[in-house]
Amino acid sequence: MVMTKLYLGIDPGRSKTGLALVDGAGKIVKLHIAESQNIDNEIVEFTKNSCPVQIVLGNGTNSRNICEATQRVLPEVTVAVVEEASSLYRFRCSSPAL
């Protein structure tokens, strides 16, 4: 059986943090809105039956704390921090139906 590579995407926020498991083709496998104050446990529970090969973390609000939490609970997985500035604007421009 071939294991699908999964990536953990994290959109950090002050009170809520978005979590997404995405496969190598970009297909969303699982989504969750987590409580930022309990992010350690939320990440452990969210990834319980999966093994992400990389974490992609937005550099927005609270990203430093979220990054530290991911490194505590998934120390073997590398974290790539990505620029979030104007990301919603870029998304809306590329999706005219919105």
Regions found by a protein language model. Give the residues of each.
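Phosphate- and other anionic-substrate recognition elements at nucleic-acid/protein interfaces
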Residues: 2-8, 14-98
